[in-house]
């Protein structure tokens, strides 16, 4: 079971790892065999190697990342959050604005074993 404070700390660490593109911090948030569903209909990324590659891909195409949690909740072992993000695209600097919702199933060691997100892009922004 994850409590509200621990969920907030996990989300802060998630945002910080994305903003700094810290691969070790990023994969440290997930179990070794974690599933990361960027799209509810797509094939998930599975495991630390896939997660690190995903972050490296983001680092190659994004800069000036901002990540803000609007609100979060917990239900048993599940963390739920509404969030907003923005970043500039490399090259060119086109700005992207996103809003989303995520769920993370948190294992007993505090790492996510399954992560799902649903994302909307603001009209008129590059994504």
Enumerate the predicted regions with their spans.
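Generic, well-ordered alpha-helical segments
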Residues: 43-46, 50, 64
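Structured beta->alpha junctions
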Residues: 15, 40, 71-73
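A short gly/proline-enriched turn/hairpin at secondary-structure junctions
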Residues: 35-45, 60
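Short, low-complexity N-terminal intrinsically disordered segments enriched in polar/charged residues
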Residues: 1-32, 126-127
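Hydrophobic pocket/interface hotspot
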Residues: 14, 26-27, 34, 47, ...
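Secondary-structure boundary/capping signal
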Residues: 22, 34, 63-66
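Short hydrophobic/aromatic segments of transmembrane alpha-helices and their interfaces
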Residues: 33-34, 95
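A beta-strand edge to alpha-helix "cap/lid" segment located at domain peripheries
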Residues: 1, 6, 52-127
